[in-house]
Amino acid sequence: MIPLSIRVPASTANVGPGFDSVGIALSLYLHVVVKEKADKWQVIHSFEDSIPTDDKNLIVSTACKVCPSLSPYIIEVTSNIPLTRGLGSSASAIVAGIELANQLGKLNLTTDQRVQIATNFEGHPDNVAASILGGTVIGALDGKNVSVVRIESKELGVISLIPNEELNTDESRSVLPDVFPFHEAVKASAISNVLVAALCQKKWKVVGEMMERDHFHEPYRLELVPLLPSIRKCAKEFGAYGTALSGAGPSIFILTPYEKRQEIAEQLARVFTSMKVCELEIDHRGITVNKEEHIGL
C-alpha cells in the first residue's frame, strides 16, 4: 500500500511593496507522510527539539482544528525549508495541516475553501495561497473574505540569500508603524499597483524597479537586515531584475532572468560568504497529494 503523502512548497511574500498580498511559491518543500493509525498523534521529525512531536505540532493542531473528529495517526515530516527565515515555513505547515484534515477526514474541500481556511489561520493570503496554488499570487483579505488571483512567471529565476541567524516574524513586525500617513499610503500603494501590473504583463525590468521601491515595510526593517542595500546593489550589477526582503526576513529574495540565475548566484556567493546562496525555481504546481490506495488508512 502506498501511504498518503503531501508535499507543500515554500514561499516568499511581499516581493517588495506587495505587503501581505503578493506571494511566490518556491522549490523548497515540506513533506508529510501518513504512516498508520495510533492511539495518539505522533510526529516523527529530525528538526530541533522545540518542534513538538505530538498534537501541539502546528501541522497536527491545524488539522484537528479543521476536522475536530480526526482520528490520530503517526506522521513523518521532512523539510528543506529553513525555519524562521522568511520562506513560509509556518505557512507550509498550516497548508499541510489543512490538507491532512481534508484527506483523512474526507472533507472534499475546494481549492477556494482551502485558501480561505489557510488565510484565516495565517492572517494574510500571500504565503499560504502561493503554497496551495503554486506560481505567483496576488491576494486580498477584506475582513473574513479572501480573493486571490494566480499568474504564471515561468521566465523568472529566483535566488535566495539565507543568513545563519533566525528572525522571528513577530519581532520583524514589531518595528512596523501602527499608523501610516495618508500621502505615504498613496505613494506606497501606487508602487504596489505598478508591481502587480508589471507582473501580469511580464515587464520584468519594471517588476525589478518596483520591488526595490517599497515604503510599507522595508525601510523599517533595514535595522534588522542591514545587508539588504549592499546585496541589492551587487545583484543589480550582476544582472538581476530586483531584490527584496523575503517575507519578514531575514532571507533576501532576488528575481533574475531564468537563464542567468546560476551565474548571478555564483557571483553573489563569492561576495556574501556568510550567507547561504540558493539558486531556486518558482514552483508552478503548488501543493501535491499522493493519495493512491490510501483509502485503507
From Swiss-Prot:
UniProt: ATP binding residues: 82-92
Cross-referenced Pfam families: GHMP_kinases_C, GHMP_kinases_N
Cell location: Cytoplasm
Molecular function terms, GO-annotated: ATP binding; homoserine kinase activity
Alphabetical list of PROSITE patterns matching this protein: GHMP_KINASES_ATP
One GO cellular component term noted in the UniProt record for this chain: cytoplasm
Record keywords, A-Z: Amino-acid biosynthesis, ATP-binding, Cytoplasm, Kinase, Nucleotide-binding, Threonine biosynthesis, Transferase
Catalytic activity as recorded in UniProt: L-homoserine + ATP = O-phospho-L-homoserine + ADP + H(+)
Documented EC number(s): 2.7.1.39
One BP term from GO: threonine biosynthetic process
Family matches, as Gene3D superfamilies: 3.30.230.10, GHMP kinase, C-terminal domain
Pathway where it operates: Amino-acid biosynthesis; L-threonine biosynthesis; L-threonine from L-aspartate: step 4/5
Family to which the UniProt record says this protein belongs: Belongs to the GHMP kinase family. Homoserine kinase subfamily.
Protein role: Catalyzes the ATP-dependent phosphorylation of L-homoserine to L-homoserine phosphate.
Database matches in NCBIfam families: thrB (TIGR00191)
Protein name (database record): Homoserine kinase
Species in which this protein is naturally found: Bacillus cereus (strain Q1)
